[in-house]
């Protein structure tokens, strides 16, 4: 899921033809086309046995989320924060809906998706571009009609009232999640990457304000970090705390964000954050499929910016740029999962 868009991804990996005695890319595309456009269909639907297996697998995945209390807390915070928005819908769906899925209904839904949804094809590797474009153009048996235009997610929203959600569970460590609306247009790339650097200064690792001041100096949490969601330009701060430290932790997190917004960022904090981000960006091309995932994400955002260009922007970010990017950020939701009824 990217923002408010549910994304279905098919991936196939093959050996570089340079190391083979024959050209295989046409065969690779044909195989992928068979999987995507000609799946096994029986009596107008997917095979019942396969659907039943996948329904159970999905149930298990949904049920397993609760075993990872940190992830569960973030999911619940997101669900509450975006309750009346598409982004609040779980990417895995809900247990109550799974039994309603039929083999025939699922296949009909799949066919409709393949006919009407936008499709991006990304190829990563060592190849002749013109040859690859020709093979792909002729290699897929898509049947397209009435292609829908997916609207851009709303990213600007005024917070009328901060939501505070407290829930209880049999756990040994409380989970605190604070959700913020950044109110920044990600298509304003320099401002977005200024926001990105600022988020890293705030909670991006051992060098960050939250880690140093909340975890190390005050010993209020077991872990703490901040993360951004690009397409909704929202930020979540997540931490594991003792229930009795709830009020103090919320207060201190607020103080660290206030410090950031006031431009109280040292040269060391800024340099460490930039270095961490740039090092991460440079590894994209080192991982199998890293570049294709990156450029698909860029395509979805309508930006199509290279890694090198992003690094240039990161290097140019100043403290005043961060202050400007964080100018309109607002706390929207506080979610606390506790084992203490008095928390």
Language-model segments: residues:
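Short, low-order "capping/linker" segments at domain edges
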Residues: 59-66, 161-175, 278-288
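An aromatic/glycine/proline-enriched structural segment found at the starts
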Residues: 95-96, 112-116, 120-185, 343
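Hydrophobic alpha-helical hairpins/lids featuring a short glycine-rich hinge
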Residues: 18-67
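M16 family metallopeptidases and their MPP-like homologs
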Residues: 1-38, 71-93, 118-124, 178, ...
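Active/ligand-binding-proximal structured segments within catalytic/core domains
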Residues: 32, 178, 189-202, 214
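Sec-exported extracytoplasmic/periplasmic mature domains
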Residues: 37-41, 63, 111, 115, ...
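Phosphate-proximal small/polar/acidic motifs at interfaces that engage nucleotide phosphates
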Residues: 152-156, 193, 211-212
């Amino acid at each position: 899921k990217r923002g408010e868009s549910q994304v279905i991804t098919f991936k196939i990996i093959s050996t570089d033809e340079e190391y083979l005695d024959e050209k295989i890319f046409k065969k690779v595309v044909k195989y992928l086309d068979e999987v995507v456009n000609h799946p096994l269909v029986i009596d107008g639907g997917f095979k019942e046995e396969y659907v039943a297996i996948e329904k159970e697998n999905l149930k298990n995945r949904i049920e397993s989320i609760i075993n990872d209390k940190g992830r569960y807390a973030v999911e619940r915070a997101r669900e509450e924060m975006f309750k009346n928005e598409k982004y609040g819908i779980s990417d895995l769906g809900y247990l109550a809906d799974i039994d309603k899925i039929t083999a025939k209904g699922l296949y009909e839904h799949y066919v409709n998706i393949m006919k009407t949804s936008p499709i991006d094809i990304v190829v990563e590797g060592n190849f002749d571009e013109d040859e690859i474009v020709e093979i792909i153009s002729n290699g897929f048996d898509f049947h397209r009609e009435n292609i829908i235009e997916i609207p851009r997610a709303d990213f600007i929203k005024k917070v009328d009232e901060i939501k505070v959600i407290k829930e209880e569970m049999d756990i040994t460590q409380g989970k605190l999640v604070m959700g913020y609306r950044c109110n920044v247009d990600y298509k304003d790339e320099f401002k977005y990457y200024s926001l990105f650097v600022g988020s890293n200064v705030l909670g991006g690792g051992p060098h960050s304000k939250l880690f140093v001041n909340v975890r190390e100096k005050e010993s209020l949490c077991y872990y703490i970090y901040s993360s951004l969601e690009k397409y909704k330009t929202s930020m979540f701060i997540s931490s594991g705390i003792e229930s009795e430290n709830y009020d103090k932790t919320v207060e201190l997190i607020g103080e660290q964000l206030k410090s950031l917004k006031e431009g109280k960022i040292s040269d060391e904090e800024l340099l460490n954050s930039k270095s961490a981000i740039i090092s991460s960006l440079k590894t994209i091309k080192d991982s199998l499929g890293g570049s294709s995932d990156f450029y698909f994400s860029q395509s979805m955002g309508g930006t199509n910016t290279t890694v090198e260009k992003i690094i240039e922007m990161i290097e140019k970010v100043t403290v005043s740029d961060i202050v400007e990017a964080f100018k309109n950020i607002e706390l929207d939701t506080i979610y606390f999962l506790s084992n203490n009824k008095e928390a």
